[in-house]
Curated annotation (Swiss-Prot):
HAMAP family: PdxJ. It is an enzyme of class 2 (transferase). SUPFAM superfamilies: Pyridoxine 5'-phosphate synthase (SSF63892). GO terms for molecular function: pyridoxine 5'-phosphate synthase activity. PANTHER family: PYRIDOXINE 5'-PHOSPHATE SYNTHASE (PTHR30456:SF0). Catalyzes the complicated ring closure reaction between the two acyclic compounds 1-deoxy-D-xylulose-5-phosphate (DXP) and 3-amino-2-oxopropyl phosphate (1-amino-acetone-3-phosphate or AAP) to form pyridoxine 5'-phosphate (PNP) and inorganic phosphate. The record marks 151 as: Transition state stabilizer. It comes from Syntrophobacter fumaroxidans (strain DSM 10017 / MPOB). This is Pyridoxine 5'-phosphate synthase.
Length: 238
């Protein structure tokens, strides 16, 4: 049975639109857990556009399942992670002008810097996942870097504009997930996953966890957080 981790970034996006105190992503995370979510994900960006330092601090105290902190591999963020001590850190690329994370980490070009970041996080007792494109080369580098997990970027699959293209991208995800598991890495998937396309991805037995945010938060606006999470859980393990 695959696990479902809920990203609550966009609850904070609504809050920050008015620089208000609500909706609170901490409350949303608690509701997601009550509905059966296996983990909570937040991305503390360098520009603090949605999730704030306070959110991560309070979530560390309140999350009962697993807290996964997405972040860039910068000195500032690594120190924050060492102070907060989430169960897992997912290292992601970050550009200030992007609306959301646009692609996977270039682990090939930045292997040296990532090696140092991963070593530091491991010394702090934190498991590491790398958000990477579905590329066998990147899977192999992640293994060489001794990351515990990879999160396979499913954005190209989700945004495919034809059935043929979607099938091609799906096969890339399948191949990457199989290789990750063969090498002993945990295989997660995330980005662009919704209530329709998850029906494809749930058929990949090697994927152990789905990280889903925008689709669930958008659905929650209409039907409530708990129902939105329960519906996605039913699809993930249908």
């Amino acid at each position: 049975m695959a696990r479902l981790a809920i990203n609550v970034d966009h609850v904070a996006t609504v809050r920050q639109a008015r620089r208000a105190s609500e909706p609170d992503p901490v409350t949303a995370a608690a509701l997601a857990e009550l509905a059966g979510a296996h983990g909570i994900v937040v991305h503390l960006r360098e520009d603090r556009r949605h999730i704030q330092d306070r959110d991560v601090q309070v979530l560390r105290q309140t999350v009962k399942s697993k807290l996964n902190l997405e972040m860039a591999a910068t000195r500032e963020m690594i120190q924050i992670a060492l102070n907060i001590k989430p169960e897992m850190v997912t290292l992601v690329p970050e550009k200030r002008q992007e609306l959301t994370t646009e692609g996977g980490l270039d682990v090939v070009s930045f292997e040296g810097a990532l090696e140092e970041a991963i070593k530091t996080l491991h010394e702090g007792g934190i498991a590491v996942s790398l958000f990477i494109n579905p590329d066998p080369r990147h899977i192999k580098v992640a293994h060489r870097l001794e990351a515990e997990y990879v999160e396979i970027h499913t954005g190209m699959f989700a945004e495919a504009d034809s059935y043929t293209r979607r099938q091609e991208e799906y096969e890339r995800v399948v191949t990457s997930a199989k290789l990750a598991r063969k090498l002993g890495l945990g295989a997660h998937a995330g980005h662009g996953i919704g209530y329709q396309n998850v029906l494809w991805l749930r058929n990949i037995p090697e994927i152990q966890e789905f990280s889903i945010g925008h689709a669930v938060i958008a659905r929650a606006v209409l039907v409530g957080m708990e129902r939105a999470v329960r519906e996605m859980l039913a699809l993930v393990n249908g």
